[in-house]
Amino acid sequence: MSRKKKVLVKLVSSAGTGVFWVKQRNPKTQTEKLSFRKYDPKVRKHVQFTEAKIK
């Protein structure tokens, strides 16, 4: 079997609520860290989500 080309990364809320999203990323083509503006249901606002490693 071949190795996976994409890795799973966790996008953690910058609001500090502990909410996170899981996304796939190809490390060969996307060298910079992912950052999205998504909805955080705990604060009921759109906030910045930044990439962190899945433990």
From Swiss-Prot:
Entry GO MF terms: structural constituent of ribosome
Record bears the keyword Protein transport: no
Keywords: Ribonucleoprotein, Ribosomal protein
Cystine bridges: none
A Gene Ontology biological process term: translation
Signal peptide: none
Cross-referenced InterPro entries: Ribosomal_bL33 (IPR001705), Ribosomal_bL33_CS (IPR018264), Ribosomal_bL33_sf (IPR038584), Ribosomal_zn-bd (IPR011332)
One Pfam family linked to the record: Ribosomal_L33
GO cellular component, one term: large ribosomal subunit
Family of the protein in this entry: Belongs to the bacterial ribosomal protein bL33 family.
Name of the protein: Large ribosomal subunit protein bL33
Organism: Orientia tsutsugamushi (strain Boryong) (Rickettsia tsutsugamushi)
Gene designation per UniProt: rpmG
